[in-house]
Amino acid sequence: MEYRQLGKSGLRVSKLCIGTMVGFTNENYEEAKKIVETGIDYGINFIDTADCYGESEEIIGRILKETGKRNKVILATKFGWYMGDGPNDYGGSIKHIIEACEASLRRLKTDYIDLYIIHVVDPNTPMEETLYALDKLVRDGKIRYIGTSKHPSYLILEGIFISEKYGWARFVSEQPPYNLLDRSIENELIPMALRYGIGITPFFPLAAGLLSGKYRKGVKLEEGRMKWRIEKMDPIVEKSLEVIEKLIVLAENRGVNLAEFSLSWLMNMQGVSSVILGARKIEYLLSGIKACDIKLTEEEMKKVDEIVPPGSYVYPYYEESIWRPARMFYSSKARKIKGTGAYIPDNKTGSDKKAGYEE
């Protein structure tokens, strides 16, 4: 396994990270435990979760305690999303950050978090307040490093300048969506990250499953998070499937599947410290581990650029992931998602309804 520096820090992380948004539940505990143990055996030392990922933090804490492997991993978790229906149950205020961190530590059964990440942009809280709280947690030994997720370049830079001004802990990572269907972060975010020492740790490396290879034109759809959109066949999805067919040809010529090809491509991209792979089944993790050993040729990288030019996108994951949550935060109320313990703002959009976020 290859290890890379996480931005402008001394922390070294495996180039593949275990994502835990799906599958890390009590019902799926044995599979989740197998995923973590197998990942560690193959050299993966990076696990990503969030306080709003249902039972995920509790499951990870239980696994690491039972296996005694807490010291083998870099544990990252996120805060800021709605954790209740109160006016201070979300965001980047001092009150919420301190309370959220203490709650995550309890669920994770640990006395420190390696990387504590602002999950989404909070337009209501000054960056100074958020960074003051995070620096306090670093000084108190509760967290070691800080990062962002789904933040535009200018806000990350604002945070860096504030940290430098006051001598506070600074951001070392940003977690954006980045994949073969959306390369838009190459225009501004990656150049900024390279210049200012921010490690990129992409999520959605398989475009929410579109790049898994199971979604193709004329093929009967399996259950999955993209099924409803593909059945609707809006223009964005239709264009995505056309691009996917071309990418599958490249993958087959290499003798690998589309998921492995897509992950390998992303691991080869400039500025990427580690790729977050949501693996709810052990075979998904093993596919990601296989991708770690695939090195695409210069010719293959050029062919990818011809299909999806640098800085372009087919599906606007990045734009949606940044601004939609920020707009939601102007709502002061939250409601529970049916059948889960998770919350979402009450100003639900059409896409929320389609995705099943109903009361």
Predicted feature descriptions by range:
Residues 1-73, 139, 356-359:
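N-terminal binding-site loop/beta-alpha segment at the start of enzyme catalytic domains
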Residues 11-16, 43-45, 69-73, 110-114, ...:
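Short, well-ordered coil/turn segments that N-cap beta-strands
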Residues 6, 18, 47, 60, ...:
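Conserved, mostly hydrophobic/aromatic
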Residues 37, 41, 84-184, 188, ...:
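Glycine/proline-rich, positively charged
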Residues 21-23, 50-52, 78-82, 118-121, ...:
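Active-site beta-loop-alpha junctions enriched in small/polar residues
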Residues 7-24, 76-89, 112, 117:
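N-terminal small/glycine-rich loop or linker at the start of catalytic domains
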Residues 223-249, 253, 271-272, 286-359:
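Terminal-tail/helix-coil boundary detector
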Residues 185-223, 257:
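Aromatic-lined glycan-binding groove of carbohydrate-active enzymes
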